Amino acid sequence: GLKTFVLVHLPVLSLTVAIGVWLFYVQHQFEDTYWREHEDWAYVDAGLKGSSHLVLPKLLQWVTASIGIHHVHHLNAKIPNYRLQECLDENPRLQQVTRLTIWDAIKTLKLSLWHEDSQRLIGFREAKRLATP
């Protein structure tokens, strides 16, 4: 009945949504990401510096349709997911980006604030430390 449906599907749906949101978040929220004002923004720099390469084990890369190779996707969204690894392998410039492991990605969860002077993301603890004279 409805109770069984909710008890089975709601946790699965919640976990799936949480993972999806986390994957999107870590692709863009890392310490040395690229954030610029409109007049200083550049397409290629935003693609290569503003999104990361989340290095996943092959099974997880397959399950996530290679979205960890996010910087290639940002440069050209028309590249099918099954060609992202090939594009990465054949283009040395695409390999010179921020690479995050799963552990690195988990650590980015503390990064919440953009520090304009250092042009990087920082956590609240560091912001408090920087604000204290």
What are these regions (language model features)?
Residues G1-P133:
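Hydrophobic transmembrane helical bundles of multi-pass organellar membrane proteins
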